[in-house]
Amino acid sequence: MSRGALIVFEGLDKSGKTTQCMNIMESILANTIKYLNFPQRSTVTGKMIDDYLTRKKTYNDHIVNLLFCANRWEFASFIQEQLEQGITLIVDRYAFSGVAYAAAKGASMTLSKSYEFGLPKPDLVIFLESGSKEINKNVGEEIYEDVAFQQKVLQEYKKMIEEGDIHWQIISSEFEEDVKKELIKNIVIEAIHTVTGPVGQLWM
């Protein structure tokens, strides 16, 4: 039995990640594909993250970084097991978000990456570009929904994309929604059909 693919959607806040993940789930109706999003706010760490994001509590940046990282590690075994059982996972945000946001706040990218060493490595990361309209939507109730901060996050994403050690697929914000939906579906299907070898380890 071939393993499943780990496909991650990344991008700035309000770039359409969740929408595109749901489009994939609806267009590829199969019992071998599942959706997962981070942070998982139902866990102990997730509830702490939710309190922070919604401004109910404050933590220093180092603690916040570790909370997001721990939240992903809580699901590392689940992800590994699902992939080995032939289940493809469509993941809304992953380690790259954690690193980009931490680095945008001034943390060392190298240090932030080290917390994620060994997580299941994605077979494909789809990065959804944000047009000026989407970026200007980034004013909201949650703590990171700020235009200037999101621009900093974007620069950190670009650094990771340029490193070339992960298979990134950038989706332009200029595509019409129906074109974007079809393009992403085709990219995901190809990734599922071409995945080979054991599950890799992130940044190892």
Swiss-Prot record:
User: Where does the signal peptide begin and end?
Assistant: none
Alphabetically ordered keywords of this record? ATP-binding, Kinase, Nucleotide biosynthesis, Nucleotide-binding, Transferase
EC number annotated for this UniProt entry: 2.7.4.9
Which biological processes are named by the entry's GO terms? dTDP biosynthetic process; dTTP biosynthetic process; dUDP biosynthetic process
Coiled coil segments of this chain? none
Can you provide one Gene Ontology molecular function annotated for this UniProt record?
A: nucleoside diphosphate kinase activity
List of residues binding ATP: G11, L12, D13, K14, S15, G16, K17, T18
Q: Which Pfam families match?
A: Thymidylate_kin (PF02223)
Q: Which reaction does it catalyse?
A: dTMP + ATP = dTDP + ADP
Q: Which pathway does the protein contribute to? A: Pyrimidine metabolism; dTTP biosynthesis
Give the source's domain of life in one word.
Answer: Viruses
Q: Which family does it belong to?
A: Belongs to the thymidylate kinase family.
User: Can you name this protein?
Assistant: Thymidylate kinase
The species is Camelpox virus (strain CMS)
Gene designation: TMK
